[in-house]
């Protein structure tokens, strides 16, 4: 009888641990999904004038839609 009780307790602990782990994974996946859904695509950024197109003058990579600013020419490059 004692062995059965211990076995049931161990099973209950394992199941509750698994439920806690599964809940944590789902929260992380939801956070990732929310993070990526908030980001704009390159086309959306360009359309709204938030970045510069190919070969436009630039000083910093963040100014270009491709995020590649040539230090040699001072212009946005393609990917």
Curated annotation (Swiss-Prot):
GO terms for molecular function: ion channel inhibitor activity; toxin activity. Expressed by the venom duct. Residues 1-19 form the signal peptide. Pfam families: Conotoxin. InterPro entries: Conotoxin. The keyword Disulfide bond applies. Keywords: Disulfide bond, Knottin, Neurotoxin, Secreted, Signal, Toxin. Disulfide bonds join 51-65, 58-69, 64-76. It is found in: Secreted. One of its GO terms (cellular component) is extracellular region. Residues 20-50 form a propeptide. Belongs to the conotoxin O2 superfamily. The presence of a 'disulfide through disulfide knot' structurally defines this protein as a knottin. This is Conotoxin VnMEKL-024. It comes from Conus ventricosus.
């Amino acid at each position: 009888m004692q062995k059965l009780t211990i076995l049931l307790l161990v099973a209950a602990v394992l199941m509750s641990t698994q439920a806690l782990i599964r809940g944590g994974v789902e929260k992380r996946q939801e956070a990732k999904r929310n993070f990526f859904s908030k980001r704009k695509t390159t086309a959306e950024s360009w359309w709204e004038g938030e970045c510069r197109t190919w070969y436009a003058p630039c000083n910093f990579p963040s100014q270009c839609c491709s995020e590649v600013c040539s230090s040699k020419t001072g212009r946005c490059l393609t990917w």
